[in-house]
């Protein structure tokens, strides 16, 4: 590994350029999927949920069909350890024209891994996914957005061209505000350094509090009428938007949650799953009506002249 200083600069990202669209109108929308099993949830660490035999990834085809109906291409980030057993799904994702990236080897938090361990495991995960999918992958997303700067620099050394792990959400104990010193902000949510791109997960700042309106449990929790209001506020301030979802949120297949999990944690895992796919379709259509063009992160890079 080369010294990380090669990619580090004391300057902060530059101020965002003027928006290309009128307030209330959207430019680009990036729909992303963390391709993992339900037992990868950080809430379930320490339990032996994997042994239940219940899997949600085989239900992903309803989601893929919905994307086809809406004419939307998305970016998937796959956990390496499940790639081989889901090779058919990965190849179908690629066949339908979606982008595929890496979501780590085992979904453990990067803050719990040394740089050396991260490099070794990421190299292995990349090879697993590429073998299963039959194509090269160039994108990365850290589990629970726990990317750190030295590991971000390492992804470039490992052959990745873009990452999507940055989120501004200080109120969440897991998330980190990723250091992007030396990057320039190309436009809303998009940061570039040389030929490497970082895509941010948006939050909405209201009265000093960051509201994560872009996906995950918050997409499940918020009713659509509230999401519509929050997205309307967001659209007046920003022109690009990133959504992130997980396969277990796109199906209502019963999950055998372990005893002793706790009511609050069980609520976080289960709230809003039923009907969430329909709600996501509504969000997609809302963004389209405001001019948003859905595009994969790979295609976005190509349009910027990056490879």
Where are these regions (language model features)?
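Active-site beta->alpha N-cap acidic-glycine motif
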Residues: 7, 16-17, 21-96
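Conserved, mostly hydrophobic/aromatic
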Residues: 34, 67, 103, 140, ...
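Short catalytic/ligand-binding loop motif for oxyanion handling, primarily in non-cytosolic enzymes
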Residues: 39-41, 84-86, 108-111, 147-151, ...
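The substrate-binding groove and active-site-proximal loops of carbohydrate-active enzymes
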Residues: 47-54, 78-79, 106-118, 138, ...
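C-terminal domain-boundary segment and adjacent tail
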Residues: 68-70, 222-307
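Metal-dependent polysaccharide deacetylase catalytic core of the NodB/CE4 family, i.e.
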Residues: 70-151, 160-161, 165-166, 194-205
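Active-site-adjacent pocket scaffolds in enzyme catalytic domains
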Residues: 131, 135-244
């Amino acid at each position: 590994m080369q010294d990380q200083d090669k990619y580090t600069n004391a300057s902060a990202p530059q101020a965002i350029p003027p928006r290309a669209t009128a307030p209330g109108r959207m430019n680009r929308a990036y729909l992303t999927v963390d391709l993992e099993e339900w037992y990868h949830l950080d809430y379930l660490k320490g339990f032996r949920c994997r042994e239940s035999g219940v899997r949600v990834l085989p239900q992903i085809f309803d989601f893929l069909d919905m994307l086809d109906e809406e004419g939307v291409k998305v970016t998937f980030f796959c956990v390496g350890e499940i790639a081989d057993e889901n090779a058919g799904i990965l190849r179908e994702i690629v066949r339908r024209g979606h982008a595929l990236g890496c979501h780590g080897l085992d979904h453990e938090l990067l803050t719990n891994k040394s740089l050396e361990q991260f490099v070794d495991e990421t190299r292995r995960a990349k090879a697993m996914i590429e073998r299963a999918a039959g194509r090269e992958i160039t994108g990365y997303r850290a589990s629970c957005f726990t990317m750190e700067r030295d590991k971000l620099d390492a992804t470039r050394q490992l052959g990745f061209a873009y990452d999507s792990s940055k989120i501004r959400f200080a109120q969440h104990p897991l998330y980190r505000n990723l250091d992007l010193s030396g990057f320039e902000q190309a436009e809303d949510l998009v940061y570039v350094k040389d030929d490497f791109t970082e895509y941010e997960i948006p939050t909405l700042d209201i009265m000093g509090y960051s509201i994560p309106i872009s996906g995950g449990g918050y997409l499940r929790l918020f009713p659509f009428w509230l999401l519509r209001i929050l997205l309307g506020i967001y659209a007046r301030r920003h022109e690009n938007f990133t959504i992130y979802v997980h396969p277990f949120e796109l199906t209502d297949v019963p999950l055998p949650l372990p005893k002793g999990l706790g009511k609050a944690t069980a609520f976080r895992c289960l709230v809003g799953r039923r009907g969430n796919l329909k709600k996501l379709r509504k969000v997609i259509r809302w963004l389209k009506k405001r001019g948003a063009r859905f595009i994969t992160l790979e295609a976005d890079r190509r349009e910027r002249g990056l490879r």
